[in-house]
Amino acid sequence: MFDSLNIFKKPENSQLSESLDQLSKDYLSSSASKKIREAIDFADKAHEGQFRKSGEPFITHPINVGLILVSLKMDVDTVIAGLLHDVVEDCDIPLSDVKKKFGNNVSQLVDGVTKLLQLDEKMKDQSQAEHFQKMALATAEDVRVVIIKLADRLHNLKTIEHLPRDKQVKKCRETFDLYAPLAHQIGMHKMATELEDCSFKTLHPTRYKLIQDALEKNNLDKKTLISRVKRSLNAKFKKNDIEAKITGREKRVFSIYQKIKKKKFSFADIYDVFAFRVLVNNGADCYKALGLIHNIFTPITGRFKDYIAVP
């Protein structure tokens, strides 16, 4: 989802800034994009002389967080708060300076992310996961705070190889126990699966590679396949006067691993590597669409479930 932005590829700071500026212009006003550029400059000065474990200037992290938020089409205040989320905690910048420069909304979001970090540090193990989710939503007040924190966590996972192994394991388990469930809870399922996949890759690199290699061995042009299936279904539905919205995706490595583990399958037994969703207007059209789908694709015996009749 987020890799298509060419983030996490270690480009120069100016390239990251330009990418963020360009992407923000796709859906935000010119005045909003100008504020984002001002926030980048503010964060750059605040983090001057700070470096990540990779040796990169620290500013690459908040800019990447901003890129993730822009890819989610978040509002300008959320993007700015993402850019500034570490300036109060890690720099000698008072929250009042953030408020004076970028307004009350941004300062409240930045403050909320700081409080979430403090809450995170109090959580010791999985038994507190449900409590963390409740406290995170209560502490944040504004769900945008949680979204910024999830974007922050995602970029940190994408660059986690520079941490000592014990810290990698801690962060990934914490993500599985706390942050991925929190993302699911607020309806950000794509973000949740991205977090799970990154954590799984770090915790179990051999298992991840085995599944990834098996997927690539199929030599499927994924985009072409998804596009072809969608075109085929759309043509069939249009011919039969069914209005439908069709989306398709390749399932994530961790999702496939869970199925292999739960069902005790081998990879060869996993048929649903790709998932398609068909949304129609009513139940009658749903059954009609299903019949048309079965005319195109033969159902596998014993693998079909009717969640309309039996939710």
Which residue ranges define each predicted feature?
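Active-site helical microenvironments for divalent-metal-assisted chemistry
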Residues: M1-A275, V280-P311
